[in-house]
Amino acid sequence: MKSLFDRTRVYTMTGEGSVSAEGADGIVVSLADNGSLALKDGCSYDDFDALCRANAQTDAEILLYIPALDEEQRKLLAHCAIRNAMWNRILFVSAAHKTLDALKAEYPEARISPVCDDNMVRPWIYAAYMGAPAYLMEAKEILLDADAWGSPTVDRAHNANVCIFAIGADDEDTVKALVRVGCDAVLTHDAVMARGLVW
């Protein structure tokens, strides 16, 4: 099975502000519950603005993991992304699905991605219904039903035209298995290792 992209993408979870040095496709950052952006030691919304500016001239994407946010916080993030011409390269990721739903209602062009776990039945249908181009799931859950020919989980996501991103792809065997079954992206702490396996 092939990825919906031209190849499996690599997103670095190192917490650095720019991904160009590692050659990854994107960076994963988390907005903390208190409104600080967790890069290395926790930063402010201003640092999200700086992160957008630092990556505006690259092809890098930002996977921004957000907690439950109120309307004002969602507006602040959206305007920051739009102001820096990064809107189409930010994927708002969250386990707070109501926040994603509200963000999508307020900004229909927002790219959202729910975090799903093994308790969710048919997450690909759920993601498609939300208007999400992708959903995130633990690598071990994606590989649970995998065999030599692929993974029904990945196949079903692709049949729904939804990408599946794997969290926790930090060793060679896991990355190789995810690429083999057609996973669309891996989120890793070792982008150099993963990049060498997918390119």
Language-model region placement:
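Phosphate-group recognition and catalysis centered on beta-loop-alpha active-site segments
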Residues: M1-W199
